[in-house]
């Protein structure tokens, strides 16, 4: 009798353990896509000031490459989309606080980001370049010449860290417009803006009266860009990546990119002499 009682306790213990494990698994279940589907809406963090990835057009509509790709993703998932605007740090915080579903703002998909976020498949390939004054190249002919120069940008970006590694003095901005960045370089408040080549190309072409240019043949870090997701939101991450794969295969990414960049940025660029810089 005693032996049977012990066996019964062991069996009950096994049942209780199984129930506990099931409850824990249920508590840890990823409902990120289910929540979006039930709410019928994606909430996306962006800046609204980064031409041509996220900006307001003449009709005061939020548009841009990243914005339009995100809109197409929502359309194919059959949900609405709402954008919340922050600077880069604010976008990161909104993900960490789960106030937004993903961030769309030309984010570099680098190893540092991978430690803290889930990264989408790339929607854009590019490399880094420098905007300088038209009259004198801001005294810069190579990355080594950044030492002592004033580099403009938002804090905590890989571009600013690269400039700092070469000895530049960092001048930080809070979600400033492209025009302000370029004007400050032109009038000598800063010496350079280190950022994405295609963004800089479109910005300088959009503001031809500001006497700045992209420094010739000083390019570094072939990069790929995309969306950032909370580390725990694997279900939503997977769902969006499925749609991005469809958009690449059917040519939609190419079509949207050519509208904003006059180039197919969904494929790796054919550019030589791109230096590799390890950004700490």
What are these regions (language model features)?
Residues 15-18:
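C-terminal motif of bacterial Sec signal peptides marking the signal peptidase cleavage site
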Residues 20-22, 67-76, 226-265:
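Extended ligand-binding regions for polar small-molecule ligands
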Residues 21-27, 158-171, 212-215, 244-280:
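Ligand-binding clefts/hinges and TM-proximal coupling segments of bilobed small-molecule sensing domains
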Residues 27-106:
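Extracytoplasmic small-molecule ligand-binding "clamshell" domains
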Residues 48, 125-132, 206-242, 263-280:
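Periplasmic-binding protein-like
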Residues 71, 80-145:
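Acidic, polar ligand-binding/catalytic clefts
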Residues 83-93, 138, 156, 172-187:
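Short helix-initiation/N-cap motifs at beta->coil->alpha
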Residues 93, 107-115, 162-165, 187, ...:
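A ligand-binding cleft/hinge motif common to bilobed small-molecule-binding domains
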